């Protein structure tokens, strides 16, 4: 949640991002061009979808072994793999972090990678995805990301 200066509480990542945009955050998290902005939002939702599928896996793995559905686990891992492949292709185009300017898709992707690493639901996700690894390394060097990294267990 975000507590604004006026004590208003904002929650949900997309609402917080929109609040920051409305406040004129610099650099802007979304491009001024509507189509470019829509492309960034689509990548944001792709990263969010990966987190949703990862959460399904986490919850399924919490069930007793004999009640776990292998089909649910496989289906969601496949969703994650396909989505990661799409993000890898976009990251390989080199369009993210141009001139160090962070955007909403970068933030969502960094959060998603952090969640995958924390929960370990997709082992070796990074083996065939060097552009995403490079993006993650760049993001996690930022103070804003480093401050939100969960402590080591």
Question: What residue spans do the PLM features occupy?
Answer:
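GST-like fold's C-terminal all-alpha helical module
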Residues: 47-134
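C-terminal end-helix/capping segment
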Residues: 127-148
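Non-transmembrane alpha-helical segments in soluble domains
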Residues: 17, 21, 41-44, 84, ...
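A general structural signal marking secondary-structure boundaries and capping sites
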Residues: 24, 91-94, 143
């Amino acid at each position: 949640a975000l507590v604004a200066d006026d004590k208003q509480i904002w929650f949900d990542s997309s609402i917080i991002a929109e609040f920051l945009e409305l406040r004129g955050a610099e650099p802007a998290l979304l491009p001024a061009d509507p189509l470019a902005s829509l492309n960034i939002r689509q990548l944001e939702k792709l990263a969010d979808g990966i987190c949703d599928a990862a959460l399904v896996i986490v919850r399924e793995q919490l069930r007793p072994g004999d009640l776990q559905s292998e089909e649910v686990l496989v289906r969601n891992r496949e969703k994650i793999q396909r989505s990661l492949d799409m993000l890898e292709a976009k990251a390989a185009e080199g369009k993210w972090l141009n001139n160090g300017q962070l955007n909403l898709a970068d933030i969502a992707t960094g959060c998603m990678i952090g969640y995958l690493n924390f929960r370990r639901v997709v082992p070796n996700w990074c083996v065939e995805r060097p552009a995403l690894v490079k993006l993650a390394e760049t993001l996690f060097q930022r103070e804003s990301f480093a401050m939100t990294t969960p402590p080591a267990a």
